[in-house]
């Protein structure tokens, strides 16, 4: 290791302070700025002080990043007069009125004299690169979700609609050779029944693809309609609780909540072997939470999932599109609890 005395550490630190692109500000215990390097003068003025409401920072600050927002002034640490050592991401306005992202640190460096250091490092290029990577990931996830949805629709069309239409086609062809009037009427009634069932299948598929009530009336109405249809089709009771009433949310959020709940219910139908499923939707502070709970078979999360596994994967994919998360708690023989949490 190089001997610090031989290279005059104080001189190097002074040169770093004077020539660094990092913005460095020193302040006393009262918040009065006592020194700043040239880089800091792009944002702060030597006449500024932040003894009361952190004026030197606040009058240039456009918000800091917290757990809920990229830019927010809510619960800012500078509102407290007892500021401890901290680091955070903040958006500051430069003297040419450009808003730039910075990584900031604030810490006590000389306890005897009460000297604090406030530093800012521009992270614009890092943020831009992260945003590009995030957009690329989201694009891949979106394309993957779309392809999975297309595959599902293709299977539904082939297994139900097309098969029923082929059945009708055969029945109609046979009518040409039917001479018995009574049998002809029976065949016609059978065709009528098949067509009616085909219409129901197409209608149900349309609702599954995108229920009109979701766009027109929101989650509450869409879920009530879907649960009623689900109970009629499968004989499984849905116990639904909610505190959102007719509250509307962002369209993307409503879509994700609807799809994740729908997928969780269908998984319970396929694998849980239950007579009822509990569904809860609630708004808690700045979060929208959806739960689907069954007391069925459960499964081992560490083992290979039944079926294709795309259902569980798709739920996580959808949640990530709106910065949400899906948590699955399950144990063999003790049921499954699927929880979706989305910041709003």
From Swiss-Prot:
The modification Phosphohistidine is found at residue 158. GO terms for molecular function: 4 iron, 4 sulfur cluster binding; ATP binding; iron ion binding; phosphorelay sensor kinase activity; protein dimerization activity; protein kinase activity. GO terms for cellular component: cytoplasm; plasma membrane. Keywords: 4Fe-4S, ATP-binding, Cytoplasm, Iron, Iron-sulfur, Kinase, Metal-binding, Nucleotide-binding, Phosphoprotein, Transferase, Two-component regulatory system. [4Fe-4S] cluster binds at residues 58, 61, 73, 76. InterPro entries: HATPase_C_sf, His_kinase_dom, Sensor_HK_TwoCompSys, Sig_transdc_His_kin-like_C, Sig_transdc_His_kin_sub3_dim/P, Sig_transdc_His_kinase_NreB. This is Oxygen sensor histidine kinase NreB.
């Amino acid at each position: 290791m190089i001997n610090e005395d031989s290279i005059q550490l104080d001189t190097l630190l002074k040169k770093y302070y004077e020539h660094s692109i990092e913005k460095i500000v020193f302040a006393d215990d009262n918040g009065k700025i006592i020194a700043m390097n040239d880089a800091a003068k792009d944002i702060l003025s030597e006449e500024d002080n932040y003894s009361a409401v952190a004026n030197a920072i606040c009058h240039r600050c456009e918000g800091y990043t917290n757990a809920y927002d990229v830019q927010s002034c809510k619960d800012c640490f500078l509102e407290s007069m007892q500021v401890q050592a901290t680091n955070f991401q903040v958006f500051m306005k430069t003297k040419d009125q450009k808003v730039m992202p910075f990584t900031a640190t604030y810490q006590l460096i000389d306890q005897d004299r009460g000297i604090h250091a406030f530093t800012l490092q521009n992270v614009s290029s890092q943020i831009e690169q992260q945003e590009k990577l995030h957009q690329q990931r989201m694009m891949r996830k979106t394309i993957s979700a779309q392809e999975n949805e297309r595959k599902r629709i293709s299977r539904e069309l082939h297994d139900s609609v097309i098969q029923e239409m082929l059945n009708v086609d055969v029945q109609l062809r046979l009518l040409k050779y039917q001479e018995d009037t009574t049998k002809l009427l029976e065949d016609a009634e059978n065709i009528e029944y098949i067509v009616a069932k085909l219409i129901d299948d197409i209608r149900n598929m349309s609702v599954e693809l995108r229920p009109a009530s979701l766009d027109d009336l929101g989650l509450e109405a869409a879920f009530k309609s879907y649960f009623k249809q689900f109970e009629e089709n499968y004989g499984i009771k849905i116990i639904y609780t909610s505190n959102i009433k007719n509250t509307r949310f962002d369209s993307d959020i409503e879509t994700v909540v609807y799809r994740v709940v729908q997928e969780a219910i269908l998984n319970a139908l396929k694998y849980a072997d239950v007579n009822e499923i509990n569904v809860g939707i609630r708004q808690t502070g700045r979060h929208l939470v959806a739960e689907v709970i069954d007391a069925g078979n459960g499964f081992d999360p560490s083992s290979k999932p039944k079926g294709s596994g795309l259902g569980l994967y798709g739920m996580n994919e959808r949640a990530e599109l709106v910065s949400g998360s899906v948590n699955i708690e399950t144990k063999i023989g003790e049921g499954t609890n699927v929880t979706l949490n989305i910041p709003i």
